[in-house]
């Protein structure tokens, strides 16, 4: 098959080399965007008198037929035509004849592919934002059910202080809110049209870039044609934002994996989000959580891969940029699916409230309460810290907890300690009293929930 760019060449290409250079196997994901961009481009060519109205109408009709065929899965792409752009142009030629060759007037594949990617990512980010908003709604709803559910709070994966389970959920709500803000803020750098930049220097034809941008729904155009065809910052930013988002999902998944274990038993995932073992009949594995945790690494890899591709590229277009698409496509699919799976896990998981609270009775996470109690009685906090630390050691040696220490022993430690100490040491009291702004106290959780609902 003759190449559309073959005029300068005498020798024929070889199939195995064509296969290496072709991108149609993956960039066909942008067929819809490529047709959309071409429709806007031909409309602009007609408006500006670069082609006749009749020619514009004929090309437009052909492109719309191809849109219908694409929707029906009837377009067949060929590696011989390299990429989605040449495939569509070749198919258009088959549809309407030689006039199809006028479509590429005042356009290069360089600005064409950049336009496709902006269109694709703009819609993909909108879809991800929608799913992220749904996840935030799920978290708020779940937190609303568990304001007074007590669980251990951890540092170093050791029991630290008791907290409300809602407080834990709302911590992730805060993380996902920042993810949402980053994605929404990035849209303005995606929503820019490079169409009309041509190969790198613009074109001699009297085009109207603002018109084609308006037809495509872009809010701005690139001010510099070199920048327009070579910019991939918007993809890097998306990959970076996605990496942070996946990191947040992965952290929560790590906790779910721990919490579903026999050692914790804090939560139970439904069968839909679990799998079994081919040899161990009793197993119920949190595979979906593990997969999200694992897929986080591939999103990181896509980010680093893209940065590495770009780090040594001179302006403007280089074939290296063919490597900018697969990581983007993969990240879009991974993030979108991970968000939907994760929201389903959280929405349907069973919370074992009694086990959560019981676990706070078999630890020393109330030690800070005793230290604070002494400090409020006038004991310098560092001295109180020392006293309680020694008492914890004593308790561990005797196999008891702070709430089991006899009152007589508390009196020996410090006569300022009164019988209300046992109420102070209860997990519920410990949580209730932490009512500083942003704290885990029930009143503060209700404030946080109200604020979260307002932000949905």
UniProtKB/Swiss-Prot annotation:
Disulphide linkage map: none
GO molecular function: argininosuccinate lyase activity
EC numbers on record: 4.3.2.1
GO biological process: arginine biosynthetic process via ornithine; L-arginine biosynthetic process
GO CC entries: cytosol
Transmembrane segments: none
Annotated keywords: Amino-acid biosynthesis, Arginine biosynthesis, Cytoplasm, Lyase
Biological pathway: Amino-acid biosynthesis; L-arginine biosynthesis; L-arginine from L-ornithine and carbamoyl phosphate: step 3/3
Annotated localization: Cytoplasm
Enzymatic reactions: 2-(N(omega)-L-arginino)succinate = fumarate + L-arginine
Keyword Transcription regulation: no
Pfam families assigned: ASL_C2, Lyase_1
PROSITE patterns: FUMARATE_LYASES (PS00163)
NCBIfam families in the cross-refs: argH
Family of this protein: Belongs to the lyase 1 family. Argininosuccinate lyase subfamily.
Database matches in HAMAP family: Arg_succ_lyase
Name of the protein this chain belongs to: Argininosuccinate lyase
GN (gene name): argH
């Amino acid at each position: 098959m003759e190449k559309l760019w073959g005029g300068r060449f005498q020798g024929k290409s070889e199939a195995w080399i064509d296969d290496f250079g072709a991108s149609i196997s993956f960039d066909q994901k942008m067929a819809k965007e490529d047709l959309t961009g071409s429709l806007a481009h031909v409309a602009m060519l007609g408006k500006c008198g670069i082609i006749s109205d009749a020619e514009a109408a004929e090309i437009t009709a052909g492109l719309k037929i191809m849109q219908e065929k694409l929707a029906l899965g009837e377009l067949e792409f060929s590696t011989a035509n390299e990429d989605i752009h040449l495939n569509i142009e070749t198919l258009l030629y088959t549809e309407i004849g030689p006039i199809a060759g006028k479509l590429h007037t005042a356009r290069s594949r360089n600005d064409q592919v950049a336009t496709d990617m902006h269109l694709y990512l703009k819609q993909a980010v909108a879809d991800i934002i929608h799913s992220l908003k749904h996840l935030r709604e799920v978290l708020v709803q779940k937190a609303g059910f568990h304001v007074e559910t007590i669980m251990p709070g951890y540092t170093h994966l050791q029991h630290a202080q008791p907290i409300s389970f809602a407080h834990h959920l709302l911590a992730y709500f805060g993380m996902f809110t920042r993810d949402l803000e980053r994605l929404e803020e990035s849209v303005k750098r995606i929503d820019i049209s490079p169409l009309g930049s041509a190969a790198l220097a613009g074109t001699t034809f009297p085009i109207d870039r603002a018109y084609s941008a308006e037809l495509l729904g872009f809010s701005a155009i690139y001010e510099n044609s070199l920048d327009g065809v070579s910019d991939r910052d918007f993809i890097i930013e998306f990959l970076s934002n996605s990496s942070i988002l996946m990191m947040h999902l992965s952290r929560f998944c790590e906790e779910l994996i721990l919490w579903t274990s026999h050692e914790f038993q804090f939560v139970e995932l439904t069968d839909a989000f679990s799998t079994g073992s081919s040899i161990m009949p009793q197993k119920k594995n949190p595979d979906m959580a593990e997969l999200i945790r694992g897929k986080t690494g591939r999103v990181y890899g896509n980010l680093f891969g893209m940065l590495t591709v770009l780090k040594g590229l001179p302006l403007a277009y280089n074939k290296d940029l063919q490597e900018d698409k697969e990581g983007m496509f993969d990240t879009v699919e991974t993030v979108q699916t991970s968000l939907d799976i994760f929201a389903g896990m959280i929405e349907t998981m069973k919370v074992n409230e009694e086990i959560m609270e019981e676990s706070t009775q078999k630890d020393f996470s109330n030690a800070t309460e005793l230290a604070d109690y002494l400090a409020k009685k006038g004991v310098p906090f560092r001295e109180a810290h020392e006293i309680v630390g020694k008492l914890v050691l004593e308790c561990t040696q005797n196999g008891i907890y702070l709430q089991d220490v006899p009152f007589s022993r508390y009196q020996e430690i410090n006569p300022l300690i009164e019988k209300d100490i046992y109420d102070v040491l209860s997990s519920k009291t410990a949580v209730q009293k932490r009512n500083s702004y942003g704290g885990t106290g029930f009143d503060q959780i209700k404030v946080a929930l109200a604020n979260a609902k307002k932000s949905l």
